[in-house]
Amino acid sequence: MSTGLVNAREKEYLHLHRIDKHKCSHSSATSSPSSAASSESSRTRQRRSDGEVYGSRHNNYKSSSQHRRRSRSGSDSPQVRHYSGRTSRDRQRMRQARDHPQASRCIGVFGLNTNTTQQKVRELFNKFGPIERIQMVIDAHTHRSRGFCFIYFENLGDARVAKDACTGMEVDGRRIRVDYSITQRAHTPTPGVYMGRPSRPLGRRSRERDYSTRDTSRSRRRHRDESSSVSPYDSNRRKYRSRHRYDRSRSRTRSYSRSRSPRKPVRVQSRY
């Protein structure tokens, strides 16, 4: 009887021990997803905080860079557009001044014959009033008239009368046009072909240097024009010729190296 009670108690103890182990494993299994979820949420919060910090830094950098650009330029885009509009107005004002110049003591005579001299111009305009000076525009290379000149009268009224009376007059077979000068200051010689008469006559060496420089510039310009207008056929022929020349030079070098290569010594066996 006592042995049966002992066996029953052992079975009950083993059963209870199995139940406890099952509960412990179940509790650990249920607690692991919650811990994983909590760690994932903590990592998400960390990422969000890092993103907010990066975003704030990026916004601060953008604002500072925009501020630096504005401080360097000193103006925003509307002011730039205002500046461009002001430039267009200035161009329009200059165009109007060129088309309708103001009355001045200096008048320009255009369309003259290149053979018309300064003395001939003075004889034509001297009858309208005293002339301060006459400036003939001379070509620096040919030393001939460019076909127009500027006349400076002492009085504004005399210049106005000469302009109205001489516009359309025929001088040396050419019909001239007379108009007020745009600039009020004296006309200075300009660089290039359109220049005034030099202050001292050019020597022989300076003229030869001038002509040689001009011929060199012309030949360079002609060479650039010819090189820019090469047809595809000519370019292909040039490529073929250069390639053929390169192949021939390589073959010559190879044959020369072969002929210069050292020969192997021939052994002669003695019969004795």
Curated annotation (Swiss-Prot):
Q: Where is the composition biased (Basic residues)?
A: 238-266
Keywords carried by this UniProt record: Developmental protein, Differentiation, Phosphoprotein, RNA-binding, Sexual differentiation, Spermatogenesis
Task: Mark out the compositionally biased spans (Low complexity).
Answer: 26-41
Give the compositionally biased regions (Basic and acidic residues).
87-102, 205-218
Domain RRM as annotated: residue spans: 105-183
Q: Which residues form the signal peptide?
A: none
Q: Provide the residue span(s) of the region labelled Disordered.
A: 21-102, 182-272
Q: Which InterPro entries match?
A: Nucleotide-bd_a/b_plait_sf, RBD_domain_sf, RBM, RRM_dom
The domain comment in this protein's record states: The RS2 (Arg/Ser-rich domain 2) and RNP-CS (ribonucleoprotein consensus sequence) domains are required for both male sterility and female-specific dsx splicing but the RS1 domain is dispensable.
Query: Function of this protein?
Result: Required for female sex determination in somatic cells and for spermatogenesis in male germ cells. Positive regulator of female-specific splicing and/or polyadenylation of doublesex (dsx) pre-mRNA. Splicing requires an enhancer complex, dsxRE (dsx repeat element: which contains six copies of a 13-nucleotide repeat and a purine-rich enhancer (PRE)). DsxRE is formed through cooperative interactions between tra, tra2 and the sr proteins, and these interactions require both the repeat sequences and PRE. PRE is required for specific binding of tra2 to the dsxRE.
Q: Which family does it belong to?
A: Belongs to the splicing factor SR family.
Q: Which PANTHER family match?
A: TRANSFORMER-2 SEX-DETERMINING PROTEIN-RELATED
- What protein name is recorded for this chain? Transformer-2 sex-determining protein
Q: Which gene encodes it?
A: tra2
